[in-house]
């Protein structure tokens, strides 16, 4: 039999090296398993709609997300064109549907408003964004 002997007196390629080969194969298989990207929560639609012009001031802003969001870590704010916060400060996730985030508004005058949202999805991934809507002035 040909083969090189190692210090233990066993030939290379014997049972001693078998666990190393199996470990290597298992590591390659484990690393090749696809991993889910997670359930980041992104807006699906909103009311008022992104970029819309409203004839009547909305009573609130609602955003529907494509997945559930964490109530304790999700906020929604509305700002006027000078950067002043104008919402009622009652931002909340809908208790009956954790994909909806809403905030109340006072009667707003004509102008352009920026909606700013920040949410944590159930998988703990953070997303945030902004959009604008306008309220028509009297002609």
Regions found by a protein language model. Name each.
Residues 89-92, 103-105:
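Beta-strand-rich interaction surfaces with strong enrichment in secreted/lumenal proteins
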Residues 96-102:
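Aromatic sugar-binding surface patches on proteins
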Residues 24-34:
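Bacterial N-terminal signal peptides
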Residues 61-62, 67-89:
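Short, surface-exposed alpha-helix to beta-strand junction/turn motifs within ectodomains of secreted
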Residues 38-57:
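N-terminal edge beta-strand
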Residues 104, 109-118:
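A glycine-anchored, Pro-Gly-centered beta-turn/N-cap motif
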Residues 54-56, 60-67, 124-139:
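Extended, polar beta-sheet/loop recognition surfaces of beta-rich domains
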Residues 3-24:
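Bacterial N-terminal signal peptides that target proteins for export
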């Amino acid at each position: 039999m040909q083969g090189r002997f190692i210090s233990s007196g066993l030939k290379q390629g014997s049972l001693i090296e078998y666990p190393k080969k199996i470990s290597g194969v298992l590591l390659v298989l484990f690393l090749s398993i696809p991993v889910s990207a997670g359930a980041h929560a992104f807006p699906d639609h909103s009311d008022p709609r992104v970029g819309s012009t409203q004839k009547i001031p909305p009573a609130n802003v609602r955003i529907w997300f494509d997945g559930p969001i964490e109530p304790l870590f999700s906020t929604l704010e509305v700002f006027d064109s000078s950067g002043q916060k104008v919402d009622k400060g009652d931002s909340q996730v809908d208790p009956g549907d954790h994909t909806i985030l809403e905030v109340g508004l006072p009667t707003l005058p004509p102008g352009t408003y920026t909606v700013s949202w920040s949410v944590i999805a159930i998988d703990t991934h953070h997303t945030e964004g902004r959009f604008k809507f306008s309220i028509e002035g009297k002609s």
